[in-house]
């Protein structure tokens, strides 16, 4: 009798284990999109820790140094502070009614150069193509590429397209901007001199093919609520 009771108890335990397994099926890991892979390669997973970003956007031509625009951005509050020449503007992007349009347009432009890998994830209204092979515009090296195309209405860049070339590690190396999705390139530059700022990787220099034109980002600071090693 004791033996029969033990067998019955063992049977109950086995059934219980099987029931638990069926109630907790193995979680299927979601495949990342190409936008997420590129963003993560540049440190997007650390963006949640970012409290403040500072940088200066300038364009140097030959020996002429650009004056630049300096920005402080608090992304969690979406507050922006701009300094350029004698102009100082502080505003919230949650209320743009009283903000000069040229100031916010400049911020969106300059932020795009600094954080285009993340814009691929942030800009949900844009269309991103499938990955294909293409010849990079500056190095003429064959790389993987995608095109991000913006809607024809709304925003500061309606209908514009960007061809983005990246390496095997999903790091952006070059791009081409095509205004209004024109077949003719409007601007092509490199993405080089990457630095890591508390886990966020930013390309500091963007040069044309002749090397005498350089759109650069300086004075970069990324402040986080926790230290990223």
What is each stretch, according to the model?
Residues 13-16:
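C-terminal motif of bacterial Sec signal peptides marking the signal peptidase cleavage site
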Residues 26, 30-101, 124-127, 132-135:
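N-terminal mature ectodomain segment of secretory-pathway/periplasmic proteins
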Residues 90-160, 182:
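Flexible, processing/modification-adjacent segments and terminal tails
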Residues 65, 73, 99-104, 118-127, ...:
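A general structural signal for short secondary-structure boundary/capping elements
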Residues 18-20:
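Bacterial signal peptide processing site
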Residues 142-229:
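Gly/Pro-enriched, hydrophobic low-complexity segments
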Residues 2-8:
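Sec-dependent signal peptide recognition
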